[in-house]
Amino acid sequence: PLGVEEILVTARKRSESIQDVPVAVTALSVEQVERGNIQRVQDLEKLAPNVEMYDMAFGGGGMSASIRGLSFDDLEKTFEPTVGTVIDGVFAASNSGTDLDLFDLESVEILRGPQGTLFGRNTIGGVISINRTKPTREFGVKFKTDLEEDNTSDVKLIFNAPIGDNGGLKVSLRRLQSDNFAFNVTRNEREKMRDLTAASIVY
């Protein structure tokens, strides 16, 4: 018989069916993120309604998110953003460092509207909740390489291993490089448009 796949979300900090949650939430799976060519948090606006995200002009790996028109475009640590970012259950207190790379992703949930009851005062616009994969407690390697124009190379590696009877270790690495159209005559080479190295260890 035909059936409808149940979508589980953790918008209220517990696993529930998306049909039972009284919150406007967009839940994205790994497959949806990959099909949408979502590379980092900022790209999620392609798949979620009433959401805009853009780079912070003053760096810091920051991103300004706007949900239903509510946003805060600053990295100042003494001011809280109007849209909160939660990474693996940990709340990011400012916009700095929130434009994460999403190559090691388990799920994404975008909650629209005030979420202060569960997430605190600086979530009047909503919350972007990002969950990365956890150790599988089994030996395994996932490796992927993409080569594109402009000398773009994107190498991704995830390694899992068991530790003892109940523990696990996960190591994830990514190396992304891409040339710019600008040529540096002093160094006789093209400037790098993107040059990213990311690593994480979870146990």
Give short role names for the model-derived ranges:
Residues 1-2, 199:
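Intrinsic disorder/low-complexity segments
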